[in-house]
Each structure stands twice: as structure tokens, then as C-alpha cells.
């Protein structure tokens, strides 16, 4: 009888917890205004004023009709009619216009989950549209079908890349799409970089390079796929509703 009541209360607690989590997910995030931290791209005004000051109708050193050091008709050290340290008539750190802002915009907060994911996946390469550079690999031993190409590869393999460029696996529908994109961007970047140094590649070089990079891209996909699968499983089993459900099932089995 006692176990039956305990099982009922645990079931009710599970339903309440699950509902609360669902409601939390549906609640809209509060919108952020200027300097509230809600904007992903905060304002770019400099703390000392506008980088390009407005051009009013006053003479040299007399913006907006005021005297020397008197912008907008205020007294000495009183911009826009406010007191000392009060731009635009506001208090200290309460600028009222698009220029002359005193308080710095708050920096956007970076989620630790995103930082950890980026560190685990690889370093993002600037200027390549979100591509990441994988860790160094050993160049695979490949047989090309004839002695000449096999010997040529062994003698020139050091000239081919040992790292690949790639995007997260969740942006592709299958392995083939990932590998195709990975090979294209890696061969292109390596060819351009090497050509600027005065070294050119022959058709044989490009053919062998594509084969080598293809094998490395397949290896990179397998690594990223396994890592992504592991992170997804850990997130699922660490959520409170799942933990409560597992505990309830264990209680029913043991009881």
C-alpha cells in the first residue's frame, strides 16, 4: 500500500516537472534594448563620443550654434544644456543621443556550451565562411595502380596537405556531401597557398592530392560524427525529466 502511494506521488512529480520544463522552453526571451545585453550586436558608439561628429551650423569650434566649448548652447563644459558630466541634459552615464555616449555597450555573453563545442570540433578559420581546420593527420599510404605514380606519391607526399577544412557534420545530409565539400575547399586552399609561394602543381599532383585529401576527409567525418553522437547522448540523459523517469522505472522494477 505504501509503495503504491509512493509510486503515485513520484508519477505526479514526474508529470509536473516535465510540464514545467516544457513551459520554460516556450517562454519568450525578453528583448534587449540599448546597453541591456539583449542585442547580439551591441552598438558601436565610442565611449568618448561619436567618431564622426555632426556638422552643425556653427563656426569653427562652435557646433550647433554654441560658443567655444559650448555645444548646443550650453555653458563651459556643459554640452547640450546639462550640468558638468551630464551630456544631453542627463545624469552621469546617461547619454541621450546617438553621439556623446559615455557608458560602454555591454559585451555579448558567450555560452560556455558553444565555447566547449568549438574547442572540441576544431579552430574556426577566419575568412572561410565558418570552415574549421582539423588536427594534423598522417598521410595515408595509397596505391594508384602503377609503379610510376606510386613512386611519385612516395617522393612528393610531403607537399600535400595533412589537415583538412570542414564544417560541422550536422550541416550535411550524409557523409558524401561532407567529404565532397571537404575535399574541394582543402585542395583549393592548399593549391592557392602553395602557388603564392612560387610552387606549382601538375595534373598528377592534383590527382594524388584529391585522393589523399578524400581519405583524410572520411576520417575527419567519422571523428566528428562520433563526437557529435556522444555529445547528443550526454545531453539527453542529463536532463532532469529523463533522470526522474529512469528513477521511477527503477523504483517500479525493484518494488
From Swiss-Prot:
Membrane-topology descriptor: Lipid-anchor; GPI-anchor
Residues binding Cu(2+) 2: 72-74
Residues given in the record as Cu(2+) 3 binding sites: 80-82
Sequence repeat boundaries on the chain: 54-62, 63-70, 71-78, 79-86, 87-94
Keyword Zinc applies: yes
Region: Disordered, residue numbers: 27-110
Compartment(s): Cell membrane; Golgi apparatus
Glycosylation site positions: 184, 200
Covalent S-S links between cysteines: 182-217
Signal peptide start-end: 1-24
A Pfam family matched in the record: Prion_bPrPp
Binding sites annotated in the UniProt record for Cu(2+) 4: 88-90
UniProt-listed SUPFAM superfamilies: Prion-like
GO molecular function: amyloid-beta binding; aspartic-type endopeptidase inhibitor activity; copper ion binding; cupric ion binding; cuprous ion binding; glycosaminoglycan binding; identical protein binding; microtubule binding
Function noted in UniProt: Its primary physiological function is unclear. Has cytoprotective activity against internal or environmental stresses. May play a role in neuronal development and synaptic plasticity. May be required for neuronal myelin sheath maintenance. May play a role in iron uptake and iron homeostasis. Soluble oligomers are toxic to cultured neuroblastoma cells and induce apoptosis (in vitro). Association with GPC1 (via its heparan sulfate chains) targets PRNP to lipid rafts. Also provides Cu(2+) or Zn(2+) for the ascorbate-mediated GPC1 deaminase degradation of its heparan sulfate side chains.
Disease: PrP is found in high quantity in the brain of humans and animals infected with the degenerative neurological diseases kuru, Creutzfeldt-Jakob disease (CJD), Gerstmann-Straussler syndrome (GSS), scrapie, bovine spongiform encephalopathy (BSE), transmissible mink encephalopathy (TME), etc.
Subunit structure: Monomer and homodimer. Has a tendency to aggregate into amyloid fibrils containing a cross-beta spine, formed by a steric zipper of superposed beta-strands. Soluble oligomers may represent an intermediate stage on the path to fibril formation. Copper binding may promote oligomerization. Interacts with GRB2, APP, ERI3/PRNPIP and SYN1. Mislocalized cytosolically exposed PrP interacts with MGRN1; this interaction alters MGRN1 subcellular location and causes lysosomal enlargement. Interacts with KIAA1191.
Domain notes: The normal, monomeric form has a mainly alpha-helical structure. The disease-associated, protease-resistant form forms amyloid fibrils containing a cross-beta spine, formed by a steric zipper of superposed beta-strands. Disease mutations may favor intermolecular contacts via short beta strands, and may thereby trigger oligomerization. Contains an N-terminal region composed of octamer repeats. At low copper concentrations, the sidechains of His residues from three or four repeats contribute to the binding of a single copper ion. Alternatively, a copper ion can be bound by interaction with the sidechain and backbone amide nitrogen of a single His residue. The observed copper binding stoichiometry suggests that two repeat regions cooperate to stabilize the binding of a single copper ion. At higher copper concentrations, each octamer can bind one copper ion by interactions with the His sidechain and Gly backbone atoms.
Family: Belongs to the prion family.
Name listed for the protein in its UniProt record: Major prion protein
Organism of this sequence: Camelus dromedarius
Amino acid at each position: 500500500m505504501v509503495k503504491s502511494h509512493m509510486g503515485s506521488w513520484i508519477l505526479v512529480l514526474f508529470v509536473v516537472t516535465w510540464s514545467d520544463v516544457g513551459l520554460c522552453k516556450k517562454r519568450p526571451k525578453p528583448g534587449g534594448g540599448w546597453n541591456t545585453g539583449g542585442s547580439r550586436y551591441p552598438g558601436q558608439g565610442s565611449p568618448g563620443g561619436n567618431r564622426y561628429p555632426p556638422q552643425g551650423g556653427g563656426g569653427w569650434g562652435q557646433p550647433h550654434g554654441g560658443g567655444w566649448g559650448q555645444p548646443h548652447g550650453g555653458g563651459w563644459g556643459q554640452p547640450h544644456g546639462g550640468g558638468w558630466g551630464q551630456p544631453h541634459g542627463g545624469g552621469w552615464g546617461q547619454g541621450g543621443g546617438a553621439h556623446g555616449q559615455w557608458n560602454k555597450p555591454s559585451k555579448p555573453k558567450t555560452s560556455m556550451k558553444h565555447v566547449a563545442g568549438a574547442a572540441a570540433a576544431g579552430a574556426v578559420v577566419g575568412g572561410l565562411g565558418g570552415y574549421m581546420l582539423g588536427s594534423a593527420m598522417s598521410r595515408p599510404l595509397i596505391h594508384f595502380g602503377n609503379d610510376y605514380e606510386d613512386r611519385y606519391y612516395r617522393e612528393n607526399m610531403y607537399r600535400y596537405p595533412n589537415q583538412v577544412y570542414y564544417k560541422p557534420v550536422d550541416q550535411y545530409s550524409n557523409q558524401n556531401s561532407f567529404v565532397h565539400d571537404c575535399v574541394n575547399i582543402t585542395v583549393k586552399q592548399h593549391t592557392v597557398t602553395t602557388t603564392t609561394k612560387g610552387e606549382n602543381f601538375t595534373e598528377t599532383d592534383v590527382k594524388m592530392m584529391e585522393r589523399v585529401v578524400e581519405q583524410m576527409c572520411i576520417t575527419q567525418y567519422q571523428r566528428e560524427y562520433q563526437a557529435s553522437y556522444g555529445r547528443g547522448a550526454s545531453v539527453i540523459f542529463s536532463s532532469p525529466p529523463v533522470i526522474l523517469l529512469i528513477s521511477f522505472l527503477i523504483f517500479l522494477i525493484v518494488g
